[in-house]
Amino acid sequence: ETPHPKNNTVYERYLPAARGRSGKRRAVVVLPQWNAQPNEHLALSRVIAKAGISALRLSLPYHDQRMPPELRRADYIVSANVGRTLQVCRQAVLDTRRAVDWLTAKGYERIGILGTSLGSCLAMLAAAHDRRIEVAALNHISPYFADVVWEGLSTAHVREGLDGSIDLERLRALWLPISPQPYVERMRGKRVLLVYGRYDLTFPLRLSRQLVHEFRQRQVAHEVRVLPCGHYSTGIAPFSWLDGYTLVSFLRKHL
């Protein structure tokens, strides 16, 4: 548990699949981006449900109803407090695995995960540590948590709080447990989609390509989609339509 009681209750939005397709019951845990609003990713979740796959949209730690009154943003999950960032990201992964517990208790036999931005990192960590998650759609990718914070446009204020106290090499080592890179081998045997934007300044292109290279070098099966947009423009039409189609098509095919 964290020191904030509000944050210790997990909130989820459950969208059951539309009827019509026979076979094994399928569900996807949806992890939104950092500082996502309560209604974000609900439209995508509805499309997933209409495609015959139930969707469970999870509120990340310190987001939505889980945010204590002293916060206006979910700063505790990504901040210059290195230890707290580790702890809260770990909590997010544990929350996700408990969501999988809930889905299996409801009789779902095939479970996937979809994560965007920070949610993508957390989704890969959850999938790497949970054999029940068979399919992972990772939307915006990087091998290292620290490098995104260090180089990304959206985390410049976090780096400002770190400057002068720690260098990138040390930060990368400390945040390695919450980085995808050490867990690439654990994704072997799963269906994995890696999506990134060609003009992304928040998850810089070099980092996205580096994670793809890790999968290729280790010969861990995966698919790659490169979108003709940046980070936040992924959420704006027509790029949001292209991104949504890419993600849902992959889930529908492999789950």
Residue ranges of each PLM-predicted region?
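C-terminal catalytic histidine-bearing segment of alpha/beta-hydrolase fold enzymes
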Residues: 209-255
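Alpha/beta-hydrolase fold nucleophile elbow
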Residues: 104-117
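Glycine-rich nucleophile elbow surrounding the catalytic serine of serine-hydrolase chemistry
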Residues: 115-127
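N-terminal cap/lid segment of alpha/beta-hydrolase-fold proteins
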Residues: 1-21
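The feature captures the conserved acid-bearing segment of alpha/beta-hydrolase catalytic domains
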Residues: 151-207, 213
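Active-site loop->helix "elbow" adjoining a glycine-rich segment at hydrolase catalytic centers
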Residues: 88, 92, 117-120
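Cap/lid segment of the alpha/beta-hydrolase catalytic domain
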Residues: 30-91
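Hydrolase active-site cap/lid region
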Residues: 124-170
